[in-house]
């Protein structure tokens, strides 16, 4: 449903939302990555507060006061030993829903190196597990393949990253990007912006801790110290979990919860599998279909 608005416009005359100028639109399920890379156009910082009004819309007449991670008592743990990983898994297993976030060296989920995974099951407490090899991931395989609800932001990216590293994450899922795209399709859905608008919170920015990458608008995350990356990634998981509590309520109030649960979310692993495996198409058939759709 989120992927076929242009066809809807042709069929029903509804004007489709204007395409973003960014090369990686956050609400495009077929975009290759979620990464917090430098935007194509840095939006001007509004001089107003982003008070929530039900969908994250800014109130331009309120003064902006954003809190940061240091304004809250928090516990972000680096799970870099077998003992720490075991303790993390034991704690997460007590919950039937938790959030996770992957960190990689680049924007390609299938080829770039996995640096670590963050987990969070309650606000202001999260873990970051550095990944140096397959053995580290084996410690969390039962979690990722277990029955708990997995929450994330642009989960398709994370599913593909872990699939490329030998783990097929099982649902159910909750994706904060998809949830916001469903209830507020005309707005941007980046996690940093949602944190400002819905939580009045300013996140750690990757551009402030990473070196410039080889390509324009890319960042090199490979040299970030584990402690710094750990705080950044743990905060990502923490804030995404907090956003999910708000967005779950908003999706329900919007009357689109059934659509979200039965159509949008089940498509996540399907799309991830398609991108991981690849699909074979006949150019002639695509051209024929394009002509037919264009004639509608």
What kind of region is each of these model predictions?
Residues 1-117, 131-142:
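Long, highly charged low-complexity segments
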Residues 8, 99, 244, 248, ...:
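A structural signal for well-ordered alpha-helices, especially hydrophobic packing surfaces
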Residues 16-18, 216, 293-296:
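A short structural micro-motif
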Residues 65-76, 108-253, 263, 267-271:
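Active-site-proximal helix-loop-helix substrate-binding element of RNase H-like nuclease domains
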Residues 100-103, 120-122, 153-154, 162, ...:
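Generic beta-strand/beta-sheet core signal
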Residues 255-258:
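Membrane-interfacial loop-to-helix junctions in multi-pass inner-membrane proteins
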Residues 261-296:
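Extended, well-ordered alpha-helical scaffold/bundle regions in very large, multi-domain proteins
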């Amino acid at each position: 449903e989120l992927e076929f608005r242009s066809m809807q416009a042709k069929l029903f005359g509804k004007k489709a939302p204007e395409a973003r100028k960014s090369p990686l639109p956050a609400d495009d399920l077929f975009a290759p990555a979620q990464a917090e890379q430098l935007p194509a156009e840095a939006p001007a910082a509004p001089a107003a507060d982003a008070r929530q009004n039900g969908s994250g819309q800014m109130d331009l007449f309120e003064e902006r006061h954003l809190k940061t991670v240091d304004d809250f008592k928090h516990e972000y743990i680096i799970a870099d030993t077998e003992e720490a990983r075991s303790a993390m898994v034991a704690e997460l297993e007590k919950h039937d829903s938790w959030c996770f976030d992957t960190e990689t060296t680049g924007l390609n989920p299938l080829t770039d190196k996995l640096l670590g995974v963050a987990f969070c099951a309650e606000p202001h407490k999260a873990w970051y597990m550095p990944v140096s090899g397959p053995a580290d991931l084996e410690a969390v395989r039962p979690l990722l393949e277990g029955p708990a609800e997995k929450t994330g932001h642009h989960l398709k990216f994370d599913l593909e990253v872990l699939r490329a590293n030998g783990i097929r994450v099982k649902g159910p899922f909750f994706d904060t990007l998809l949830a916001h795209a469903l209830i507020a399709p005309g707005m941007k859905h980046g996690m940093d912006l949602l944190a400002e608008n819905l939580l009045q919170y300013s996140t750690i920015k990757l551009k402030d801790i990473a070196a410039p990458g080889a390509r324009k608008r890319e960042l090199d995350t490979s040299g970030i110290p584990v402690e710094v990356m750990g705080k950044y990634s743990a905060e990502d998981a923490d804030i995404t979990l907090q956003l999910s509590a708000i967005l779950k309520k908003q999706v329900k109030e919007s009357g689109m919860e059934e659509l979200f649960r039965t159509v949008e979310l089940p498509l996540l692993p399907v799309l991830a599998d398609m991108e991981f495996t690849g699909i074979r198409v006949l150019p002639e058939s695509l051209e024929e279909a394009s002509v037919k759709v264009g004639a509608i």
